[in-house]
Swiss-Prot record:
Belongs to the CRISP family. GO terms for molecular function: calcium channel regulator activity; potassium channel regulator activity; toxin activity. The lineage of its organism: Eukaryota, Metazoa, Chordata, Craniata, Vertebrata. Residues 1-22 form the signal peptide. It comes from Varanus acanthurus. Keywords: Calcium channel impairing toxin, Disulfide bond, Ion channel impairing toxin, Neurotoxin, Potassium channel impairing toxin, Secreted, Signal, Toxin. Its main location: secreted. This is Cysteine-rich venom protein VAR4.
C-alpha cells in the first residue's frame, strides 16, 4: 500500500512538472480571460529575455479578432500545414502562426515555452545554427513588430496528437 501511495505521488508530481496536470479542454479555452492573460504574460515574459535584447520589442496584447482567426485554424484540425495566407490576413496584415500538438492536454505556458526553447538552435543575425533544426516557432514568439495576438485550442479526436493549440501573431 505504501508503494502504491508513493507511486501515485510521484506520478502526480511528474505529470505536473511536464505540463500535464489534470486538465481538460475547458481548462484551456481562450474565451476565459485568465487563460488569455496566461498566454499574453508568458509571451511578454519570454520576449523580455531575448538575447541580445531587442531595442524596440513591442508588448503583446490580446485581440479577439485574431483569436477568432486562430480558432478557425484550430477547427481545421490540419496539423500538417499552416493556414493559407488568405485565412490569416487580418486588416491587410499577414499574421504569423504557431501550432502545438500533443496527445494529452498541456498548459498554454508549456506549449509557448516549447516554441521559445527553439532559441537554443537560433543565433541572432545568422539564423538556425545548423541545417534541419526548427526555429520558426521561436521567431514568431519574439518577432519585434508583432504586438497583437490571439490563440485557440481544439480537440481533434481523429489525430494521434489530438490537442491542437494555435496562436496567430500580427
Amino acid at each position: 500500500m505504501i508503494l502504491l501511495k508513493l507511486y501515485l505521488t510521484l506520478a502526480a508530481i511528474l505529470c505536473q512538472s511536464r505540463g500535464t496536470t489534470s486538465l481538460d479542454l475547458d481548462d484551456l479555452m481562450t474565451t476565459n480571460p485568465e487563460i488569455q492573460n496566461e498566454i499574453i504574460n508568458k509571451h511578454n515574459d519570454l520576449r523580455r529575455t531575448v538575447d541580445p535584447p531587442a531595442k524596440n520589442m513591442l508588448k503583446m496584447s490580446w485581440d479577439n479578432i485574431i483569436a477568432e482567426s486562430a480558432k478557425r485554424a484550430a477547427l481545421r484540425c490540419n496539423q500538417n500545414e499552416h493556414t493559407p495566407v488568405s485565412g490569416r490576413t487580418i486588416g491587410g496584415v499577414v499574421c504569423g502562426e504557431n501550432y502545438f500538438m500533443s496527445s494529452n492536454p498541456r498548459t498554454w505556458s508549456f506549449g509557448i515555452q516549447s516554441w521559445f526553447d527553439e532559441r537554443n538552435y537560433f543565433k541572432f543575425g545568422f539564423g538556425p545554427t545548423r541545417a534541419g533544426v526548427m526555429v520558426g516557432h521561436y521567431t514568431q514568439v519574439v518577432w519585434y513588430k508583432s504586438y497583437k495576438m490571439g490563440c485557440a485550442i481544439n480537440l481533434c479526436p481523429n489525430e494521434p496528437l489530438k490537442y491542437f493549440l494555435v496562436c496567430q501573431y500580427c
